[in-house]
């Protein structure tokens, strides 16, 4: 039975196994068509989990070294494989577009291809783990202690002081927003947010019967003077804020700006809901989350959906102790409990360090796509961060955002009009949000951005009708 000699200790074990496979195939130690050990056999020989071996085999298949056949096992590939694409595959030919096909650049999500191979092994490990039976049962309020501790481990990359006792598990970040707003404010309370904000906040405020006001913004997000003036006129109960890579504008608050916002919250006695869903994309990791500037009046929210995979519907609320019981009660009354099975999968990903490896890959992929956008959108006013998944395109006159969005779709590209992000419909916006991470292939993204550049550069929109 083949057992690899592992030389590298500065990388994940599964990568060392994949490297050993490549080395032994190249040297002739492993022959074309040779059958490899089963997951369990090699896991026992190396004293690792079957999930680790599954990830190693999947990585080797991605490199074109192996092939698998259902019921027969895994074999050394008999014929050379096609070159393995990068997460965003480079174009082999000029872009083509099928009639009626629309490229969707409207949904913010991570690169699915980057995570899929890695997560197959995590799913195998979940099924074989000692906590599998517990993950099939009901969970206590707030979540199982080990799941809350894994949440705290994820949070410590931004909040070093995080502990599992102050973590509440939710069914994703959107559920976390609903839980926090429902539990900590009352009907007809005033909720503040950015003047251009995540549409999910707008729909929540409407369905929960909260009043919503948008605060004026600049390049760093909410303007302190505008926030203070609004607080002098009305009494807000909560500020919902995205301080890093804000959706849709990508605005990111400086250290000084966060201090000012926290001081205003203290002065006017309102809560802060710090939605840090994109915090892992920060270009300056030294800047702390907004919640850490006013920890006793802040609830911090994040999830793994944007860094790992949208289907991983697990979010984490981090709260001061005095608010925990209200948050856990609202989780119970809304969904009874987030899925313990999904929470266990998320915990395994965090505990094995897979989350940080995926964060690194997603950041690298986002940076590549931002560079491509700068190349293909010359002369246009765009707002973006070096690692943000999206950009904000400010349209020249005489465009309106709604008109541009309609015509872009007719040209085969779907983006979102700035009107969908307006907390209050009190004027026209000329901005549109363009998501760069959705297309799988570089030629698709190139086509979409080229179409948008051509459209935005037109002096007379009427010629597209």
Task: Label every PLM stretch briefly.
Residues 193, 214, 272-274, 346, ...:
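Hydrophobic residues in well-ordered beta-strands that form the structural core
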Residues 409-433, 463-465:
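Conserved PLP cofactor-binding pocket of PLP-dependent enzymes
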Residues 134-268, 280-299, 457-464:
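Conserved core of the PLP fold type I
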Residues 1-127, 136, 332-339, 364, ...:
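N-terminal basic, amphipathic alpha-helical segments
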Residues 318, 392-394, 435-437:
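Short hydrophobic/aromatic beta-strand micro-patches
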Residues 363-374, 382-395, 404:
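Conserved glycine-rich beta-strand-loop-beta hairpin in the small C-terminal domain of fold type I
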Residues 299-363, 460-461:
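Conserved core segment of the aminotransferase class I/II
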């Amino acid at each position: 039975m083949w057992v690899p000699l592992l030389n590298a200790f500065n990388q994940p074990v599964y990568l060392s196994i994949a490297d050993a496979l490549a080395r032994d195939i190249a040297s002739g130690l492993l022959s074309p068509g040779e059958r490899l050990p089963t997951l369990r056999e090699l896991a026992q020989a190396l004293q690792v989990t079957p999930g680790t071996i599954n990830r190693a085999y999947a990585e080797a298949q991605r490199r074109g070294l192996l092939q698998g056949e259902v019921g027969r096992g895994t074999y050394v590939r008999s014929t050379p494989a096609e070159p393995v694409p990068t997460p965003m595959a480079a174009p082999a030919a000029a872009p083509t577009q099928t009639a009626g096909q629309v490229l969707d650049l409207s949904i913010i999500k991570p690169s699915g291809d980057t995570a899929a191979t890695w997560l197959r092994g995590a799913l195998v490990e979940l099924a074989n783990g000692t906590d599998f039976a517990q993950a099939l049962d009901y969970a206590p309020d707030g979540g199982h202690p080990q799941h809350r501790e894994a949440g705290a481990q994820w949070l410590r990359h931004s909040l070093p002081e995080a502990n599992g006792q102050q973590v509440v598990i939710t069914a994703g970040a959107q559920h976390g927003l609903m839980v926090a707003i429902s539990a900590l404010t009352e009907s007809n309370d005033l909720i503040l947010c950015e003047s251009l904000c995540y549409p999910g906040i707008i729909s929540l405020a409407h369905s929960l019967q909260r009043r919503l006001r948008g605060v004026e913004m600049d390049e760093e997000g909410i303007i302190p003077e505008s926030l203070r003036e609004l607080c002098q006129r009305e009494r807000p109960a909560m500020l919902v804020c995205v301080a890093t890579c804000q959706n849709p504008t990508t605005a990111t608050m400086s250290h000084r700006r966060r201090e000012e916002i926290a001081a205003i919250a203290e002065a006017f006695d309102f809560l802060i809901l710090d939605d840090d869903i994109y915090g892992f994309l920060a270009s300056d990791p030294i800047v702390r989350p907004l919640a850490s500037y006013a920890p006793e009046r802040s609830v911090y929210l994040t999830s793994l959906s944007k860094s790992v995979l949208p289907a991983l519907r697990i979010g984490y609320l981090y709260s001061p102790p005095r608010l925990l019981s209200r948050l856990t009660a609202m989780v119970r009354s809304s969904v009874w409990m987030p899925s313990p099975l999904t929470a266990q999968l998320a915990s395994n990903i965090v505990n094995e360090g897979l989350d940080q490896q995926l964060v690194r890959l997603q950041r690298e992929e986002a940076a590549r796509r931002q560079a491509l956008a700068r190349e293909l959108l010359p002369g246009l006013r765009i707002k973006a961060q070096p690692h943000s998944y999206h950009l904000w395109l400010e349209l020249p006159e005489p465009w309106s955002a709604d008109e541009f969005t309609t015509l872009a779709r007719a040209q085969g590209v779907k983006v979102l009009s700035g009107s969908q992000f307006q907390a209050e419909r009190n004027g026209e916006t000329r901005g549109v949000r363009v998501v760069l991470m959705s297309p799988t292939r570089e030629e698709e993204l190139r086509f979409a951005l080229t179409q948008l550049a051509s459209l935005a550069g037109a002096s007379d929109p009427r010629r597209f009708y």
